[in-house]
A protein has these predicted regions:
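Phosphate-binding loop of NTP-binding sites
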Residues: 31, 63-64, 75-190
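N-terminal leader/targeting and accessory segments in enzymes
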Residues: 1-96, 100
Length: 190
């Protein structure tokens, strides 16, 4: 059964769109899951690309949509991006890094969102939990992407979630969630 599962994973492929922190984190997780991973970014690639990840020039990325089952978009990639439109038109699943991570994390998820104060509250809650003797992860939009927490031994995952990360339907089902406040921000995107 193990060899069969590995063969099935190897047959799956994902195109990660965005080669910054969350995109690279998603690519690393997908490689750990033995998937084939393509990576593209309109702004170029970092010096270090995770092992086994295949860089794809933006001009060639749409051609890869025939080879993948899903694309994972970084928070900086707007829903109106041409590659996103092309994927949706072909029936390719579009998800966020947060959704990918949510399928694989273990532990109680606490989500923090809102216009202001997310980082402060995320850090504070994780510190309080750690002081109470719990193994707490603080991340998401704050510093460490949630995909990097997959496989970690955490009791609680306190996740800062930006409005950009909430654009895509996802499987994150927090045990606790809070919206700190809502005001007009990022109107160019929303």
């Amino acid at each position: 059964p193990c060899a069969c599962a590995e063969a099935m994973a190897a047959a799956r492929a994902t195109l990660v769109v965005g080669a910054k922190s969350s995109g690279l984190s998603a690519a690393r997780l997908l490689r750990r899951l033995a998937e084939r991973v393509f990576l593209t970014d309109d702004n170029g690639f970092p010096e270090q690309i995770p092992d086994g990840v295949e860089p794809v020039l933006p001009s060639d990325a749409a051609e890869r949509l025939d080879d993948v089952q899903q694309i994972v978009v970084s928070p900086g990639i707007p829903a109106g991006h041409p590659l996103v439109h092309a994927a949706l038109a072909r029936g390719v699943r579009v998800r966020s890094e947060l959704a990918l991570a949510a399928d694989h994390v273990h532990g109680r998820v606490i989500a923090v969102t809102g216009t202001n104060g997310k980082s402060t509250v995320t850090t504070l809650v994780a510190d309080i939990l750690a002081a109470a003797g719990r193994r707490a992860f603080a991340g998401g939009n704050l510093g460490t992407p949630l995909c990097d927490a997959v496989g970690g031994d955490y009791d609680d995952l306190v996740v800062e979630v930006s409005s950009f990360q909430l654009e895509w339907p996802h499987t994150l089902r927090p045990a606790i969630a809070t919206v700190l406040n809502v005001s007009q921000d990022h109107l160019d995107r929303h």
